[in-house]
Design a protein with these regions (language model features):
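Small-residue-rich hydrophobic transmembrane alpha-helices
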Residues: 43-103, 140-154, 158-159, 257, ...
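Hydrophobic transmembrane alpha-helices of multi-pass small-molecule transporters
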Residues: 55-58, 102, 170-175, 204-208, ...
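Transmembrane alpha-helix boundary and packing residues in multipass membrane permease domains
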Residues: 17, 21, 33, 69, ...
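Helix-terminus/linker motif at the lipid-water interface of multi-pass membrane proteins
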Residues: 22, 26-44, 113-120, 176-187, ...
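Short alpha-helical transmembrane segments in multi-pass integral membrane proteins
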Residues: 1-14, 71-138, 184-240, 296-361, ...
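Short runs within selected transmembrane alpha-helices of multi-pass transporters and secretion channels
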Residues: 64, 133-151, 159-167, 192-205, ...
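N-terminal transmembrane alpha-helices
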Residues: 2-33, 37-38, 54-66, 70, ...
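Transmembrane helical elements of multi-pass membrane transporters/channels
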Residues: 11-31, 132, 166, 199-203, ...
Length: 438
């Protein structure tokens, strides 16, 4: 990872990620399409549950980023023992996180939903969906920990295979469990949740199968479970800021749902649909950033600073190109995109306006996402968190609150692109300063 030409290396690491994340985003959209066929109320229930579900995923992925960064850095420095200790501690802590998330998420969900709606049918649907999803939280945590471990050692094709297998099975199970088939009864929104959990379980099975039959540079070992407070501190030092980076959108969605609900429930539905579409539009770029992250960590550990700089520049260019394509899709295909999720003319009209405004910030957002990912790879979790705080808290919340008073609900949509422009002005100097200290 420190000798191969940078561009082919980045492409070889990123391409499996891009493919797997495209499949994952396709699953998210297909899953929502099936739920939307149940009713618009079912889609609203998913939109309301989304912030807590996203927060749980943020813990899994964010802590996994810490595992990934530490393994890659220790391997780059030639310290296999430390890399294995980081992997083992990371897996054990991930399992603990999963148990806690299951208990806490199920406990708080009824009260959380009642903050946004008094409709008992919506609340019941949200509780049904979330309870089943969070019962699989520990399985999801273990799967994502394995994903980051395989990525750290350059086995991107394994993570691609595991994710695609789980997502395809999920997509196939959705119509069967939601609407019923033969002896399988129609389960409605509960079927969508169960299909998601089974898909996560099957992805984990792929990782376990490959791990048991393949020689890897890093193994999970009982001998590495001995307490190591210094290592755990470093894992959380990278993982906690990464978790906050990923969890901040949940806080943002909760805040924006509160603003938009004051106009009509259709705006809440549109925001939920946008975030489903956002996974499809952003995940290819995020796949490139994921491919960059272990490479930057490895080369930083090996003191190859010129390669670190080149990796950042190439990732930025590739991400911006992908987001330019996303902008064109939203500008010229906003109507058919919305029609995938709803037949309500009012919701479609609101969604068209929202997509055409929000997408104005897509290209410039590449600066923030690339800088944040590079900083995580360098182990600069705090600096990465600064960028995310700007994107999801410090800029957009005040802007949305102020602009909606002058522009109505459209003010919320305008807050998105203005925030991306302001965040880019912060992100690049923060990255340059951090690299200067390396």
């Amino acid at each position: 990872m420190k000798e191969k030409p940078v561009l082919p290396l980045l492409v070889s690491m990123a391409l499996p990620n891009v493919i797997s994340m495209l499949v994952n985003s396709l699953y998210n959209i297909v899953d929502s399409l099936f739920v939307a066929r149940i009713s618009e109320d079912a889609m609203t229930a998913l939109s309301l549950v989304f912030p807590i579900q996203n927060f749980a995923n943020a813990i899994a992925i964010g802590f996994g980023i810490g595992i990934n960064a530490m393994i890659a850095r220790y391997l780059g420095a030639g310290d296999r023992k430390k890399a294995e200790t980081a992997a083992t501690h990371g897996m054990a802590l991930s399992l603990m996180h999963g148990i806690l998330i299951t208990i806490l998420s199920i406990a708080i969900m009824p009260g959380f939903l009642r903050r946004f709606t008094g409709d008992e049918s919506l609340i019941s649907s949200g509780i049904t969906y979330s309870t089943i999803v969070f019962l699989f939280a520990t399985i999801n945590m273990a799967g994502l920990a394995f994903e980051k471990m395989f990525q750290a050692v350059g086995r991107m094709k394994v993570t691609m295979a595991a994710l695609i297998f789980g997502c395809v099975c999920n997509i196939l199970l959705d119509p069967v469990l939601i609407f019923g088939l033969g002896p399988v009864p129609a389960m409605g929104i509960a079927g969508a949740a169960l299909a998601t959990g089974i898909g996560q379980l099957l992805s984990l099975c792929v990782y376990l199968f490959v791990y048991a039959r393949t020689e890897l540079p890093v193994r999970l070992r009982r001998s590495c479970l001995r307490p190591d407070a210094a290592l755990d501190k470093r894992l959380y030092g990278i993982g906690v800021p990464a978790i906050l980076n990923l969890a901040l959108p949940s806080l943002l969605v909760t805040f924006l749902n509160g603003l938009l609900a004051g106009f009509s429930q259709s705006y809440v539905v549109v925001l939920g649909i946008y975030y489903k579409l956002q996974t499809f539009l952003y995940l290819p770029a995020n796949g490139i950033v994921q491919g960059m992250r272990p490479l930057i960590g490895y080369n930083y550990g090996a003191r190859q600073h010129a390669r670190v700089k080149k990796l950042y520049e190439l990732t930025l260019i590739m991400s911006a190109a992908i987001m330019a394509a996303g902008t064109l899709i939203c500008l010229f295909a906003s109507c058919p995109l919305m029609q995938l999720f709803t037949s309500n003319p009012e919701t479609i009209a609101i969604g068209q306006t929202a997509l055409r405004i929000i997408c104005l910030g897509f290209v410039v957002s590449a600066v923030s996402t690339t800088s944040s990912g590079a900083l995580e790879g360098l182990g600069k979790g705090t600096e990465s968190l600064i960028i995310s705080l700007c994107r999801y808290l410090l800029f957009i919340m005040p802007l949305a609150a102020v602009l909606c008073h002058f522009l109505g609900a459209n003010g919320v949509w305008h807050a998105f692109w203005i925030t991306e422009a302001l965040s880019a002005l912060v992100a690049y100097p923060v990255y340059r300063r951090a690299v200067g200290k390396c």
